[in-house]
Amino acid sequence: MKYTLTRIDPDAPVERYPQEQRQTVEDPLAQEASRGIMIGRLEEVLQDTVNWGRKNSLWPYNFGISCCYVEMCTAFTSPHDVARFGAEVIRASPRQADFMVIAGTPFIKMAPVIQRLYEQLLEPKWVISMGACANSGGMYDIYSVVQGVDKFLPVDVYIPGCPPRPEAFLQALMLLQDSIGKERRPLSWVVGDQGIYRPQMPAEKDRKRGERINVTNLRTPDEI
């Protein structure tokens, strides 16, 4: 599997945020593990164990901007049982949360606030962009709206829709869990930039393209 190595680039231009340098690499543990090297196998087991704990205990930060936040809150009601994913513990402070959901329209005045809250999240941290407005500005192609939160934040999962259904939010959690399960992070006591390896997951539209092309009987709106 291809991985994206992300490192902090302090010499990057100030107007670029986050100040990261990315490059595509191979799995850093696959080569050592395939050769049967003891240290490589041990590190692979440790990585899988730590990732298992992280992906099954995702604490979201309670933050919403606009109408998509209503659908996000609906996903936390009893019919959807978000506790299955270990994400029912909503945090009131970003310092106690694992990931942040940008649910709503990111206005330019709100962008510095979102960026500040993201910086207060402790590593490891992830971002989900929920809804058309957060993904690309939606129908608000105007001066006061940022055309996508990925202009100033690194986004891990995009949820399409206006607004997305609660089931779409649950699917995004599962996709984020799959991505976290394949991550490679430093297991070290050294404080500082050591690089993060994130898997290059295939887009859902590409993965389901063949299945959707083969659909011949379209359901009516009342059957969906």
Swiss-Prot record:
GO terms for biological process: aerobic respiration; electron transport coupled proton transport. GO terms for molecular function: 4 iron, 4 sulfur cluster binding; iron ion binding; NADH dehydrogenase (ubiquinone) activity; NADH:ubiquinone reductase (non-electrogenic) activity; quinone binding. Its EC number is 7.1.1.-. Its main location: membrane. Its cofactor is [4Fe-4S] cluster. It is a peripheral membrane protein. It is found in: Cell inner membrane. Binds 1 [4Fe-4S] cluster. NDH-1 shuttles electrons from NADH, via FMN and iron-sulfur (Fe-S) centers, to quinones in the respiratory chain. The immediate electron acceptor for the enzyme in this species is believed to be ubiquinone. Couples the redox reaction to proton translocation (for every two electrons transferred, four hydrogen ions are translocated across the cytoplasmic membrane), and thus conserves the redox energy in a proton gradient. Belongs to the complex I 20 kDa subunit family. This is NADH-quinone oxidoreductase subunit B. It comes from Aeromonas hydrophila subsp. hydrophila (strain ATCC 7966 / DSM 30187 / BCRC 13018 / CCUG 14551 / JCM 1027 / KCTC 2358 / NCIMB 9240 / NCTC 8049). The lineage of its organism: Bacteria, Pseudomonadati, Pseudomonadota, Gammaproteobacteria, Aeromonadales. The gene is nuoB.
